[in-house]
Amino acid sequence: RLQKIATMEELKGVLGTDVDMTVFRKLRLLESHTSYSHRGRYYTLDEIAEFDDVGLWSFRSVWFSKHGTLLATAVACVDASEAGFLAAELEAILHVSVKDALRKLASDNRISREPLSGRFLYCSSDPPLRKKQIRARQLYEAEAGFGPLPLGPGIRLVPDELKAAIILFFSLLN
């Protein structure tokens, strides 16, 4: 427990075994996480990981998620977003390439891939939420003065000015 992260080989050495399943059984008992970066090569304990507001934690450029795999993490981020994500935005948050993962999730209908201004916007597979995300993104992109969509721990938040504009827009529809 002095070491924050470890590989399978390191864990085998500590446990005195050559068998992966022995390590997996022990990890299951200890409530552990597998990295979503570095091809899942690293492990950490739940009590060590200090997840941020998005559910991410890194140590020495190795990334972990409270949601588990890269696929599960991408779905959680997309579903939590108020305006969906472009692939580059999600890559900036997750610190790994996400294009293949997003294509797989879209083909499995776990998220929705929507064309928008010559790019793809990744949204929730839930139709009402997806509709809100697309509207929020369209409205956001129509406002040239806002600059890029905020990322990082505040990814769930749309600027107050945009929220006011969305409320005004929806009130005009009724």
Feature map (PLM): residue ranges:
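Long, charge-rich, low-complexity intrinsically disordered regions
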Residues: 1-80, 84, 95, 103-174
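Conserved donor NDP-sugar-binding/catalytic core segment of glycosyltransferases
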Residues: 90
